[in-house]
C-alpha cells in the first residue's frame, strides 16, 4: 500500500462483508468509503450469507449441483444454513435459508455425538453435493462420527475460516470485472 501512488485509482472495487448488515452500519461504511475517496459504484457491502452465495457459485459446478450446507461454529455454539436454488426460474433465484442452532457439549466424545445428531437433523434425507464448516469450535480430533456422517453419500466436505472473505473477493470481482453469474440472482433478506 505504501508504494502505490494513488491507492483509490488502483483498486477496482472494495467489498466489505459482515455477519449482519444494519442500516446505521451501511450508512457509516458508505461515509467512510466516500471519505477515503471511493466512488459509490466501487464500494460494496454484503452479509455473510451473500458471501456464502458468491463463494459457492465461484466453485466448480459439481460442488453446487445439489444442495449445499453450511455449519457455522462459534466455540460451543453451531448453526446451520442451506443454499437454495430455484432452477426453474430465469434467472435462477438463489437464497440462503437459516436452519436450527445448538450448543455442543465441551467434552470431546459427547461433543462429537451432539454434532453428529445435529448434522443428521439438519441435513434430513436431502441430497447434498457439498458441506462447508467454518468458524472456531470445529476440530477433526473430536469429530470422528460427525465427519463420517458428513461424508456420507459422496458429499464433499470443506472446513476452514476463509469462506466469507473469499466470497467477498469473488463478489467484488463479479461486480467490477466479470459477469460469470449472469444467469443467477441472489435473493437476500
Q: Residue ranges of each PLM-predicted region?
A:
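Phosphate/ATP-binding catalytic cores across multiple sugar-kinase/actin-like superfamilies
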Residues: 1-5, 52-59, 110-127, 171
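Short glycine-rich, Thr/Ser-proximal phosphate-binding strand/loop in the N-terminal lobe
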Residues: 82-113
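Acidic, glycine/GT-rich loop-and beta-edge segments that sit at the periphery of enzyme/chaperone cores
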Residues: 170-189
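Glycine-rich phosphate-binding loops at beta-strand->alpha-helix junctions
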Residues: 14-25, 121-148, 156, 160
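A short acidic (Asp/Glu
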Residues: 24-31, 55-57, 78-83, 139-146
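A short acidic Gly-Thr/Ser loop motif
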Residues: 62-79, 84-86, 135-138, 185-189
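Repeat-based blade/solenoid architectures
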Residues: 162-167
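Nucleotide/phosphate-binding catalytic cleft detector across ATP-hydrolyzing
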Residues: 1-68, 89, 99, 152-153
Amino acid at each position: 500500500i505504501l508504494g502505490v501512488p494513488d491507492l483509490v485509482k488502483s483498486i477496482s472495487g472494495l467489498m466489505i462483508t459482515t455477519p449482519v448488515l444494519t442500516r446505521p452500519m451501511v450508512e457509516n461504511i458508505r461515509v467512510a468509503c466516500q471519505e477515503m475517496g471511493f466512488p459509490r459504484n466501487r464500494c460494496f457491502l454484503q452479509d455473510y450469507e451473500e458471501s456464502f452465495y458468491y463463494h459457492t457459485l465461484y466453485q466448480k459446478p459439481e460442488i453446487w449441483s445439489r444442495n449445499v450446507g453450511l455449519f457455522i461454529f462459534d466455540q460451543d455454539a453451531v448453526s446451520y444454513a442451506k443454499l437454495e436454488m430455484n432452477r426453474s426460474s430465469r434467472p435462477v433465484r438463489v437464497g440462503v435459508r437459516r436452519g436450527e442452532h445448538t450448543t455442543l457439549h465441551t467434552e470431546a466424545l459427547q461433543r462429537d455425538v451432539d454434532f453428529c445428531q445435529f448434522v443428521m437433523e439438519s441435513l434430513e434425507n436431502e441430497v447434498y453435493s457439498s458441506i462447508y464448516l467454518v468458524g472456531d469450535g470445529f476440530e477433526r480430533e473430536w469429530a470422528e462420527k460427525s465427519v463420517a456422517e458428513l461424508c456420507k453419500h459422496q458429499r464433499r466436505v470443506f472446513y476452514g475460516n476463509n469462506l466469507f472473505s473469499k466470497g467477498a473477493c469473488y463478489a467484488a470481482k463479479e461486480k467490477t470485472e466479470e459477469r460469470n453469474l449472469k444467469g443467477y440472482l441472489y435473493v437476500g433478506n
